[in-house]
Amino acid sequence: MKLIYGESDVKKLKIRRIIDLSAGLAVSVAFFVIGAFCAVRRWEIGRSSAYVLSALSGGVALSLLVGTIIFYLHHTKLLSFVTQSLSPSKKISGTVTDVYNKPANKDGLMFITALISCDDGIDRYLYLPEGATVPEKGTKKIYYVIHNNYVCGTESEAENE
């Protein structure tokens, strides 16, 4: 059995990446500003507490910046893998054998699941977002498999991916 994800998952992954990177950079910049402010105050006043605060803020800012860069590289690698795999690789013919109308929670997202018995001998799950048109049980149709993780219903859907 292979898991099939839709294009909405890819969009949500991209949005999540932007939010995470923005938050990481914002916090890192905030600590850099605090560190710079403390360093300036240290020179003006000559207080040791400002020196400690500036060193701590600089260390935290540097750690957050490095963490954000690592996080960015991880997301970029993940997104490039997903983007590479979004080209149609093969057509398969399959029959919907079962539809589970009760929404399932998959990676924090709610999906309606359909089990497709494909002619290539592999049963695949098709995850549909809530509100999508659910195929009827017994429907035989040509599906376009994209990197074994995503199935489009029509050729135009596959080309648009």
PLM features: residue spans?
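Short, charged cytosolic
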Residues: M1-Y5
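Short aromatic-glycine-enriched beta-strand elements
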Residues: K102-S117
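A general secondary-structure signal for short beta-strands and their flanking turns/coil
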Residues: S89, L109-F111, T139
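Glycine-centered tight beta-turn/hairpin loop motif at sheet-sheet or coil-to-beta transitions
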Residues: S117-D123
